[in-house]
Design a protein with these regions (language model features):
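Short helix-coil-helix linker/hinge
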Residues: 1-9, 85-93
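Short capping segments at the starts of secondary-structure elements
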Residues: 16-22, 99-107
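Short amphipathic alpha-helical interaction segments
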Residues: 31-45, 113-128
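A short, conserved structural fragment
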Residues: 45-55, 127-137
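Short, Lys/Arg-rich nucleic-acid/phosphate-binding segment
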Residues: 54-60, 66-67, 135-146
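Short, amphipathic alpha-helical interaction segments positioned at domain boundaries
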Residues: 68-92, 144-179
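Short gly/ser-rich loop at a beta-strand->alpha-helix junction or flexible surface loop bordering the NTP-binding
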Residues: 158-231
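Hydrophobic alpha-helical interaction segments
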Residues: 213-308
Length: 308
């Protein structure tokens, strides 16, 4: 997560008239040690917020032009009285991530992995400075601070891209939360926390498929491996067309995937999905349970499926 020091350094760069500053100058301006400043600079570079260049014996730091930095600059310029390092730092960024629309404190705690007590405390702080409002039991960002959620999401998105691109080339993120993301790339990845998924993993469950050169990976600290239930959800997130739905049906039948386990995994992926994963999963479950009688246009005829 981004600490108060990270946001303080960003705020200083946003507020200065110099587009480039040395690490030494930053350390002096912020009254930090050179070692602490170098560490914060390195970590912000990993988030995609800044770039560095070595000139002689000096490391020069400048802001990148990613959208969340531009949005943060607009807010800090117009609302200079707000202590944004205090607002955004630590768990604040995770909480803001899930204020893209109104949510209860319980929902925010569940999605953000921040304790409920901390969520309530941070939301109370945000209410006191007018950034967050509350209607019944639901919290939402007040105008003009709605971009704070966009900033949080943008920062995590760029961090995910940079992390994945350290192990491969061009990527396309299909689904993400603040701490997990599903993406496609063109090469194999062998790194801790990255798990092969999608069509390329079906062979591991005795369903060999003709796949394209693309690879799909899930980056997660939650998983120790990709279960059949996870794989089904990932596949639907990648492509919910008839062919991929049939792949999922084959896997469900071959591995005797329990309906409850699949529904539980679908509920995990649903909040940040661009499609209704739970409804799709229920549709597949009902199709198999009824022997194809409960069939939609996107599912095969039962006899055709049994011949697959």
């Amino acid at each position: 997560m981004l600490s108060k020091s990270h946001i303080q350094l960003l705020s200083h760069l946003l507020g200065t008239t110099d587009s480039e500053l040395s690490v030494t100058s930053l350390a002096d301006a912020l009254d930090w040690s050179p070692g602490h400043t170098s560490r914060i600079v390195s970590e912000l570079k990993g988030w995609g917020c800044i770039r560095t260049e070595t000139r002689g014996r000096q490391k020069i730091v400048s802001l990148t032009d990613i959208e969340p930095i531009e949005e943060l600059e607009e807010l800090t310029t117009e609302y200079s009285h707000v202590d944004f390092p205090e607002v955004i730092a630590g768990s604040g960024l995770q909480i803001l991530y899930y204020l893209d629309h109104s949510r209860t404190a319980t929902e925010i705690a569940e999605h953000s992995s921040v304790s409920r007590a901390t969520v309530y405390r941070r939301l109370d702080d945000l209410q006191q400075v007018g950034i967050v409002g509350k209607s019944t039991s639901r919290y939402q960002l007040n105008d003009p601070f709605t971009t704070l959620s966009s900033i949080a999401r943008g920062l995590y998105h760029h961090r995910h891209r940079r992390e994945a691109q350290r192990h491969t080339g061009k990527i396309n993120i299909q689904w993400e939360t603040h701490d997990e993301y599903l993406f496609t790339c063109g090469s194999d990845i062998e790194a801790d926390g990255f798990y092969l998924t999608g069509p390329g993993l079906f062979e591991a469950f005795d369903i060999p498929l003709l796949t394209r050169d693309q690879r799909y990976y899930i980056r997660s600290n939650r998983l120790s491996d990709v279960t059949p239930a996870d794989l089904i959800c990932h596949t639907l997130l990648i492509d919910d067309g008839p062919r991929y739905r049939t792949y999922c049906l084959l896997l469900m039948e071959k591995q005797a995937v329990e309906a409850s386990a699949l529904q539980e995994r679908a509920a995990h992926y649903q909040p940040e999905a661009a499609l209704d994963v739970r409804a799709l999963v229920d549709e597949l479950i009902e199709y198999l349970e009824t022997g194809g009688e409960a069939r939609t246009d996107h599912l095969p005829e039962w006899e055709a499926f049994k011949r697959t």
